[in-house]
A protein has these predicted regions:
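Sequence/fold signature of self-assembling virion shell proteins
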Residues: 1-74, 244-344
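Helix N-cap / beta->alpha transition motif
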Residues: 135, 234-238, 335
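Assembly/oligomerization interface modules of large self-assembling protein complexes
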Residues: 46-130
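Residue-level signal for secondary-structure boundary elements
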Residues: 165, 169, 222-226, 265-269
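Short, flexible beta-strand-to-coil junctions
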Residues: 70, 74, 95-98, 226-229, ...
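Extended, solvent-exposed, turn-rich assembly/linker loops in the middle of proteins
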Residues: 182-253
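Alpha-helical scaffold segments that mediate packing/assembly in large oligomeric complexes
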Residues: 129-212
Length: 344
């Protein structure tokens, strides 16, 4: 009987298998009536109650369900690098342009001259911060629920900095020479699509717009760009799904891109769906094509002074505080002429 009780208890605890009535004896009765009390029913001293505290019947799942946030993809599209330090306010780039002309030769002629023009375009940094604080009692209370509150607050501060860095990479900082990948004033104006990709069922028509934006980059490149150039195309995840539309001939845009532009890779950027994206009324889509040419170095880079600086922990009487900071230069386009875009 003892062995059966052990086995059934393990089945219930580990596997949720319950055998009711495994003990045939009724525990509320005794062996003989003489062992039972026949006293009169007493009155209650306590408040009448037929239940128990709800906490005894509440099961708390130990796994913490983290709320998901939109991914940060700007650094993947533009590339990312560190420039300067957290005390750097301005960054200057050295830009050299070769100039020259020729004339007909003459033994005593000094006509025509070759020269070089040196320029120093600049960008300004922007530094931002967030603070975290922990109380002794709040941490202890959270620990009763098996929640590591201190760790979650640290992760929140890191995420806040990462999200803002991504925002700065896309839109820059208003009032500073600090531009984003979508609004740098030196970028060529975007072209408009010929149709709404979400409403179009013919993949050949969608590929026609893809071809147009590649041709725009080729035209701007003035011979530096061709169909074999290494491209990165940024678009929203919803817009990318239009490339999977297939007709009765098993033709889709993804296959045509691989065939015609073998070095083109797609990076999805959620923020490129403007006002809900092209799939909703009033929404638009932004598509950006970046050409990288080996002889020209990098076309664009997202730059930061520091990804995150964790400042000293401040100890209070019964709490702690910590500041975290970071700095950004936004996105720097070294050769904006190699960037084409489509908006609509």
């Amino acid at each position: 009987m003892k062995r059966i009780a052990v086995d059934t208890a393990k089945l219930e605890r580990s596997y949720g298998i319950i055998f009711m009535g495994r003990d045939s004896r009724a525990h509320m009765f005794y062996g003989s009536p003489e062992q039972m009390a026949f006293d009169a029913q007493p009155g209650l001293v306590t408040t009448q109650n037929a239940g128990i505290l709800s906490l005894f019947t509440t099961y708390v799942e130990p796994e913490v369900i983290e709320i998901l946030v939109r991914p940060t993809k700007a650094a993947e599209l533009y590339g990312e690098t560190k420039k300067g330090t957290w005390v750097s306010d301005t960054i200057a780039f050295i830009q050299a342009e070769r100039t020259g002309s020729v004339s007909s030769y003459g033994d005593f002629s000094n006509d025509a001259m070759s020269d070089a023009n040196i320029d120093f375009p600049q960008r300004q940094s922007y530094h931002y911060q967030t603070n975290t604080r922990w109380g002794e009692r709040e941490i202890a209370r959270a620990a009763e629920a098996k929640v590591d509150l201190a760790n979650w607050k640290q992760r929140s501060s890191a995420l806040a900095i990462e999200k803002y860095q991504n925002y700065a990479y896309l839109y820059g900082i208003n009032g500073l020479q600090n531009y984003g990948g979508t609004n740098d004033p030196f970028l060529p104006a975007p072209i408009a699509p010929t149709l709404n990709w979400f409403q179009q069922t013919d993949p050949t028509a969608i590929f026609g717009d893809v071809l147009r934006i590649v041709q725009q980059a080729i035209a701007q490149g003035n011979g530096l760009v061709d169909t074999n150039t290494r491209f990165r195309m940024g678009m929203s995840p919803g817009n990318q799904s239009n490339f999977s539309k297939t007709n009765q001939f098993n033709y889709n845009v993804n296959d045509q891109i691989k065939k015609n532009f073998p070095n083109l890779t797609i990076v999805t950027v959620p923020e490129f769906a403007i006002n809900g994206g092209g799939g909703v009324a009033g929404g638009t889509e932004f598509v950006q094509l970046i050409a990288e040419i080996p002889e020209g170095g990098k076309t664009v880079e997202a730059a930061f002074t520091e990804k995150m600086r964790a400042h000293a922990m401040v100890v209070k009487s019964s709490s702690w505080e910590q500041k975290k900071s970071a700095g950004t230069w936004g996105v720097v386009f070294y050769r904006p002429v190699l960037v084409a875009a489509m908006l609509g």
